[in-house]
Each structure stands twice: as C-alpha cells, then as structure tokens.
Amino acid sequence: MNIFEELKARGLVFQTTDEEALVKALTEGQVSYYTGYDPTADSLHLGHLVAILTSRRLQLAGHKPYALVGGATGLIGDPSFKDAERSLQTKETVLEWSGKIKGQLSQFLDFENGANKAELVNNYDWFSQISFIDFLRDVGKYFTVNYMMSKDSVKKRIETGISYTEFAYQIMQGYDFYELNQKFNVTLQIGGSDQWGNMTAGTELLRRKADKTGHVMTVPLITDANGKKFGKSEGNAVWLDADKTSPYEMYQFWLNVMDEDAIRFLKIFTFLSLEEIAEIEKAFDAARHERLAQKTLAKEVVTLVHGEEAFKQALNITEQLFAGNIKNLSAAELKQGLSNVPNYQVQDEDNLNIVEILVSSSISPSKRQAREDVQNGAIYLNGERIQDLDYTLTEDDKIDGQLTVIRRGKKKYAVLTY
C-alpha cells in the first residue's frame, strides 16, 4: 500500500486537484509540500491536528514538509466559511503566536534530521517586502473578480458583507504557494476542506504566472456522528497547549468519544497500523461496554501530543477520582482533574466549621440542609466521610497546603483553595 492509498484508507483524503498526477508524484520521488497555519490564537487546537498528522505521515513516507506560519495572512483574517469578519490582531501578538506555533509543530514534525527534515517559513518574510503596487501588478492581474467571486467561501459572505481585506485573502494564500514553489520547489499544498477555494487560487497562479502544475489535497473537516464540529469540549476548543487544555482534560475528551466515531478516529488521529486497528475493532465490537477503542484513542493521542508521562498522569487522575481516592493525588493533579469544579477561595475570616464551610462554598444551600447532609453521611472531605457536626477544618485537611476537596453525595464537588 503506497502512502496515498494509506491516507485514503484512513479517511484522510477529501478532495484533490488531479488524483492520478498526485499519486504519480508521491510514488515516483520526493515531493515538497506545505501546510499553512495562521496564528489566530496562542495555541493550535484539535481541529489543526488532522492536517498536522497527515503532514507527519507524508514525512515518514520520505516527503519533505514545509510548515508555513501566516505572519502576514494572520494579520488579515481568512473569511472561509466564517459568519462575520475576524477581529484583527496586532503585529506583536501575531509575532508572539507565530513563535508558539513552531514549538507545537516540532512535537509532530522532525525539523532536525535527514534530507526531508521539516522547514518552517513565515509569509511575513515576503509580504513585508512587496509593495501594494507591485502586488497588484505582479499578482492581482492573474485573478479575475469573476473567478474570486465564484469561491464558495466568498459567496457565503456576499449577503452579509465582506471587506476588501478579507476578499483579497485568497490571493495572498495563492501567492504563498507561488513563493514556496519558486524558492523551494514546493508542488503540493495540504489543508482543510474549507480551504479548497484559497488553495486552488495557488494552483491557478502557478499555472498562469509560472506555467507550472501544483497539486492540492484537502483533508476532511471532522464532525462527530451527530454532525457536530469536532474538537470542542463543552463549547470550548481542545487546545494542544497543556496550559490551556490539560492532558487530563484531553484524555477525558477522547475517552468520551461516541462508539460510532471511535474506530474512525483511531484511523485519523493515531499511528497504529490499519491491521492493529482492525484487531481493536473486533475486540471493541465484542464488548462495547469496556470502551477499548476510546481508551486506546485517549492513550495514543495524549501520548502523541503531551508525552508518555502526561498520559500516565492523566490515567492515574482518572482512576483515583473514580475510586474517590483524593488523598492519593497531589494538589497539581487535583487541579487538572477538578478544573471544571466550582472553586471557593477561603478567606481569613471564614468559619471553618464543616456546616459553615458547606454553606460558604455553596455545596449545601442552607445551614439546615448542611446539617442534614453531614448527619446523613453525604459529605466527604478529601474522600473521607464526615458525620461530626462540630468538625472544623485544620491544616491536615489541606492537600500540599493548597486545597481541600469537598464532595456532597456522589457527584457534587467543590474545591476549597487557601
């Protein structure tokens, strides 16, 4: 099975400009290819991971990746299938975010070794050197307004309004392909299926300005079995930066993937062979309740993104919280595992009697209810049941001197911080 056949078997090929010519190029020699990443936030997220891992698969097959950071296009904003104009960022912010993208990409692509080591390029390097007049003369003349208006990404914004700034974005992305082709002989661009219009602007410019053929391959935008956009947890993006989404939170995200999606996601997001995945699927179908596919998915992706130690920690937090063994975890681990739990900052003047603190932290709605909860054995302090109405919290109740975990019943938690 050649690399293109494997990408197809994994569900990673959505659309290509000329499949036969692309397969020929990929099987006959080394292809230089690129994927663009606009610095629209200070971290990449799971939505980027499909293209990143596809790029890694191609590098492992011997092809040469170029990671293009959109230092210039990030200042403009891509209108593709966005309902409204993006907020413009400052040059300083875009520069800072561009630097963070390189660090994250180096976790997946090899920038150090071999003839096909990855290269990082920034389109600000060439756009900052070209004047507006030169851009119109040397690039703009190759694009008709009719051609630009025909793009679905533009059509969807015509009714609500699109600025010239965003309208011109596709020409800028097209020029990226031209520059990379002229400087590094890049002949293939990879991106999400929502980028098709911008990407083919590049092949059009290559054809008209340089009389060369470029290839485009889009990867699918991933949705779950319910058709919801993939990569968000509780409405928030799942980030690759551990400071924005902890390894534990990412582990939980994958662990909670629906059965209908689990095997498909193993093909897309892991480097397990298709044969290994087929074996997992057999065992998974025989005992869905054991969630083997989700557990494997969570292990593989968290290890890939954050490393083996982070995976082991996420697994340990999961197991200890499930068993109620709060004291087996450090304060740092509890902050990961209980990041979405209500937090109450204990004040110096607070009464630390168990009934008082239950009301202060909103675990119990009233003192009467708090007393009933304690007497009925529904209150746990760091995993241990408290039934003494006169119990007062002490230094011994502070884990690592930083926090105390209160639980009411089976599911209602609060974290007291000091």
UniProtKB/Swiss-Prot annotation:
Q: Where's the motif 'HIGH' region?
A: 39-48
Location within or outside the cell: Cytoplasm
**The S4 RNA-binding domain, residue ranges:** 352-418
UniProt keywords, alphabetically: Aminoacyl-tRNA synthetase, ATP-binding, Cytoplasm, Ligase, Nucleotide-binding, Protein biosynthesis, RNA-binding
Which Pfam families does the entry mention? SYY_C-terminal, tRNA-synt_1b
Against InterPro entries, the record matches this protein to: aa-tRNA-synth_I_CS, aa-tRNA-synth_Ic, Rossmann-like_a/b/a_fold, S4_RNA-bd, S4_RNA-bd_sf, SYY-like_C, Tyr-tRNA-ligase, Tyr-tRNA-ligase_bac-type
Q: Where does ATP bind?
A: K232
Query: Recorded GO terms, molecular function?
Result: ATP binding; RNA binding; tyrosine-tRNA ligase activity
Which residues are noted in the entry as L-tyrosine-binding?
Y34, Y169, Q173
Q: What is its EC number?
A: 6.1.1.1
Chief subcellular location equals cytoplasm
Q: Name one GO cellular component term.
A: cytosol
* Reaction it catalyzes: tRNA(Tyr) + L-tyrosine + ATP = L-tyrosyl-tRNA(Tyr) + AMP + diphosphate + H(+)
SUPFAM superfamilies listed in its UniProt record: Alpha-L RNA-binding motif (SSF55174), Nucleotidylyl transferase (SSF52374)
Keyword ATP-binding listed? The answer is yes
The UniProt entry's GO biological process terms, in alphabetical order, are: tyrosyl-tRNA aminoacylation
Classification via SMART domains = S4
Residue window of motif 'KMSKS' region: 229-233
User: What NCBIfam families is this protein classified in?
Assistant: tyrS
What family does this chain come from, according to its entry? Belongs to the class-I aminoacyl-tRNA synthetase family. TyrS type 1 subfamily.
Cited function: Catalyzes the attachment of tyrosine to tRNA(Tyr) in a two-step reaction: tyrosine is first activated by ATP to form Tyr-AMP and then transferred to the acceptor end of tRNA(Tyr).
Q: State the HAMAP family in the record.
A: Tyr_tRNA_synth_type1
Q: What's the protein called, per UniProt?
A: Tyrosine--tRNA ligase
What is the taxonomic lineage of the source species?
Bacteria, Bacillati, Bacillota, Bacilli, Lactobacillales
